[in-house]
Amino acid sequence: EVENASSEYIIRDHSRVKFEEKKRYLQAATALLTGKYGEGVIKLTLKDQYYNMREMVEPYPEVIDKACQAMEKAGVTPIVRPIRGGTDGARLSYMGLPCPNLFTGGMNFHGKYEYCSLNTMQKAMQTILNLIELWGK
C-alpha cells in the first residue's frame, strides 16, 4: 500500500534515564504528528525487550574481577567499558544472575564486514574455562 509506511527502531543506552528520555522523545514526536494531522495518522508501539545490564552487574564487582582474572590467565588484556548491545547476559542479569558481556572473537558486528578470528575465539573459550575454574574454587 502506497499510503502506509512503517519503521522499527531499537532504543539502546548505557543509562536508564537516557533510555527513558529516548522513549519520551518518540512519544512527543507521535503527539506532535497526531496534533498536526489527526488521530490514526501515526501509531507508536513501544516494547521494552531488555535493559543495559550495568545496573544489575555493578553491585557485584567480584563478577568483573573474576572475568578480568580469567582473561589475564588466557593471555588477554581486559578492556572494561560499557556496551549497548542486547545479549542473553542482559536478560539473565535481570533474572538475578549478573552476567557481564565477554568477548567472543567477533568484530564489526551487524555489518557486512563482521568476522570472527579463530585465535580470538580460542582465547574466549579459554577465558570461559578459566572462569569455571575460578568460580569453582
Listing of model-derived features with the role each one plays in the protein:
Residues 1-137:
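Metal-dependent amide/peptide-bond hydrolase catalytic core
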